[in-house]
Amino acid sequence: DTTPCGESCVWIPCVSSIVGCSCQNKVCYQN
């Protein structure tokens, strides 16, 4: 299951990657 992190990654990387979020389909998701 993937949970949206409420962040977009169209122009910049996911800042929320520090809490385990990654970019999928231009939106940051937590795996």
Curated annotation (Swiss-Prot):
One of its GO terms (biological process) is defense response. There is a cross-link at residues 1-31 (Cyclopeptide (Asp-Asn)). It comes from the Eukaryota. Disulfide bonds join 5-21, 9-23, 14-28. Expressed in seed but not in root nodules. Keywords: Disulfide bond, Knottin, Plant defense. The keyword Heme does not apply. Transmembrane segments: none annotated. SUPFAM superfamilies: Cyclotides. InterPro entries: Cyclotide, Cyclotide_bracelet_CS, Cyclotide_sf. The keyword Disulfide bond applies. Contains 3 disulfide bonds. This is a cyclic peptide. It holds the Pfam family Cyclotide. Probably participates in a plant defense mechanism. Not active against Gram-negative bacterium E.coli ATCC 700926 or Gram-positive bacterium S.aureus ATCC 12600 up to a concentration of 100 uM under low-salt conditions. The presence of a 'disulfide through disulfide knot' structurally defines this protein as a knottin. Belongs to the cyclotide family. Bracelet subfamily. This is Cliotide T13. It comes from Clitoria ternatea (Butterfly pea).
